[in-house]
């Protein structure tokens, strides 16, 4: 009888555990909503005269679970000199935005099914008398938690996707280009610009945009060494927003370095070297220049040879003394 009661208790315990695990798994599966959104075009750069407007057709795709989305436009500004931006809470400046869709409006939620897409017709209007300059915005599509029967939002993943809009307001269409090289420097562990022949030579190039319109640098960094040897490294063109600074990279890209640099020179270097930058910003734009130099010597190799020589001489003398 006791064995029967024990088996019954074990059976009931297993039933409870199984039921609990089944509920937890189902609950996790129900709550783990997948959100996968895409928007195109991801970037718009345009010049608009005051009193004019343009219409941009965006395609918003949902590859995840059905979701409720809200489209809105906010301003952004440079966050640092690495190209990162900081979104603001609302749209600032004179530019006006609206949706030309019959059933959609900005800041109003709408439903998007799985594997469905929605076209957002964004009208960008610049009123008369708007001051010239650059204004930067992001079109955001954000998921909105669905409201349950008891007025409580359901637990689901929060997702936001953005498409940046770079607006230049100009009466004549002329762009102000005022660049400056604020840093063209080698990062050396020593006080002087001296490197070991086998070490990586890191270079930092930072440009400043002192104008009211964004600029896009082009050009190259040239390395010249002994006997007239040289190598060119092309500047990677990236936008520098108005009145901001940005670290500029050259190919081969320095993105894999542990520190933020523009170019990582690797190989075997010996003797004096000169680095020069020649940068332009399109046709009829000013060229800006900068240069620096460094010296390379195989200190580690020479130190290793000296150490091996000293050890060898010591061993030879030791054996000679033992034989005597």
Question: Which residues fall in each region the model found?
Answer:
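Short, basic, low-complexity termini and linkers enriched in Ser/Thr/Gly/Pro
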Residues: 1-32
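Short beta-strand and strand-turn-strand segments in soluble, beta-rich domains
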Residues: 36-40, 84-108, 223-236, 287
């Amino acid at each position: 009888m006791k064995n029967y009661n024990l088996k019954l208790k074990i059976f009931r315990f297993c039933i409870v555990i199984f039921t609990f695990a089944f509920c937890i798994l189902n609950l996790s599966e129900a709550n783990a909503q997948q959100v996968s959104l895409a928007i195109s075009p991801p970037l718009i750069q345009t010049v608009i005269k005051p009193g004019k407007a343009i219409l941009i057709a965006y395609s918003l795709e949902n590859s995840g679970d059905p979701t409720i989305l809200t489209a809105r436009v906010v301003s952004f500004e440079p966050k640092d000199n690495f190209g990162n931006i900081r979104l603001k809470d609302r749209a600032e400046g004179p530019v006006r935005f609206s949706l030309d869709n019959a059933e959609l409006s900005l800041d109003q939620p709408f439903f998007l099914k799985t594997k469905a897409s929605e076209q957002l017709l964004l009208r960008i209007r610049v009123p008369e008398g708007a001051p010239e300059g650059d204004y930067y915005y992001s079109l955001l599509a954000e998921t909105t938690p669905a409201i349950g029967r008891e007025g409580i939002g359901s637990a689901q993943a929060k997702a936001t996707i953005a498409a940046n809009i770079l607006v230049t307001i100009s009466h004549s269409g002329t762009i102000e280009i005022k660049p400056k090289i604020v840093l063209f420097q080698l990062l050396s562990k020593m006080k002087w610009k001296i490197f070991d022949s086998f070490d990586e030579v890191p270079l930092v190039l930072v440009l400043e945009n002192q104008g009211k319109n964004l600029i896009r640098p082009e050009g190259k960094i040239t390395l010249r060494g002994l006997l007239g040897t040289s190598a060119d490294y092309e500047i990677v063109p990236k936008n520098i927003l108005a009145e901001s600074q940005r670290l500029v990279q050259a190919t081969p890209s320095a993105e894999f370095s542990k520190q933020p640099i523009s170019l990582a020179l690797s190989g075997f270097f010996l003797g004096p070297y000169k680095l020069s930058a020649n940068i332009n910003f399109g046709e009829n734009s000013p060229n800006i220049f900068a240069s620096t130099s460094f010296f390379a010597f195989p200190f580690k190799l020479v130190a290793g040879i000296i150490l091996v020589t000293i050890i060898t001489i010591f061993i030879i003398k030791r054996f000679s003394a033992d034989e005597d």
